[in-house]
Amino acid sequence: MIKQRTLKCIVQATGVGLHTGKKVTLTLRPAPANTGVIYRRTDLNPPVDFPADAKSVRDTMLCTCLVNEHDVRISTVEHLNAALAGLGIDNIVIEVNAPEIPIMDGSAAPFVYLLLDAGIDELNCAKKFVRIKETVRVEDGDKWAEFKPYNGFSLDFTIDFNHPAIDSSNQRYAMNFSADAFMRQISRARTFGFMRDIEYLQSRGLCLGGSFDCAIVVDDYRVLNEDGLRFEDEFVRHKMLDAIGDLFMCGHNIIGAFTAYKSGHALNNKLLQAVLAKQEAWEYVTFQDDAELPLAFKAPSAVLA
């Protein structure tokens, strides 16, 4: 059978919090089968757990948060969640000694390296996927996102940014998902922001960790980072990275075709909730062997070596 995945060992890293600008220690721990993805704040006494759950997601101006019933939150979970989706990690406990996951370089790549460093272990329990059975679409003004049935996981994302740094030919990206494709084509794409927004937020004591080290920064005309872009279409690739993380908030890889136009965290989450709320639109599936499994979810050679 296709088995659930966790880590082989505990790994730790430090980074800077986007909001506070303070050092954050991140610890990733293996977890037993059917645990799911658990985010944990150890700076609170007692520590507070936040299971990844579409209904717990709140989108703020700066990041995605998970919020519990007591309005306690953990922030900036989206890029780590994308790395978990990319490598198909089903069970993990993620600890931080702060109210937020460190921003690292603004992409998912540092988290991918950390997960690969820990090693991926298979558990003796069938991995559950969410398979889309009917088309589900959500809209917000001219923005929209939808899932259609498809035997794999495909993504097609279009942005509409009227900015000199973003050529019109670099506003759409489409791919057939796989762990290898995610690592090569998506994981390194960084988040982005306007210099004026960062300066304004920092003047109000917000976004204190924001810098050229953790984002693509633009003014009205150009990219300000000395090293430029990692891909010509890094902006839309990062929006796809965000979507991969947002859609994994149900704790399962999804089998279906995702298409979006100008979508963001809030609309991606709205789509996920709309799918899960419509019982006839999806089903849980497991697979007995590799031959049945959609190519999208075969483990990359580097992972289970």
From Swiss-Prot:
The gene is lpxC. GO terms for biological process: lipid A biosynthetic process. The lineage of its organism: Bacteria, Pseudomonadati, Pseudomonadota, Gammaproteobacteria, Enterobacterales. The active site is at 265 (proton donor). GO terms for cellular component: membrane. Zn(2+) binds at residues 79, 238, 242. Transmembrane segments: none annotated. PANTHER family: UDP-3-O-ACYL-N-ACETYLGLUCOSAMINE DEACETYLASE 1, MITOCHONDRIAL-RELATED. Keywords: Hydrolase, Lipid A biosynthesis, Lipid biosynthesis, Lipid metabolism, Metal-binding, Zinc. It is an enzyme of class 3 (hydrolase). This is UDP-3-O-acyl-N-acetylglucosamine deacetylase. It comes from Escherichia coli O45:K1 (strain S88 / ExPEC). Coiled coil: none annotated.
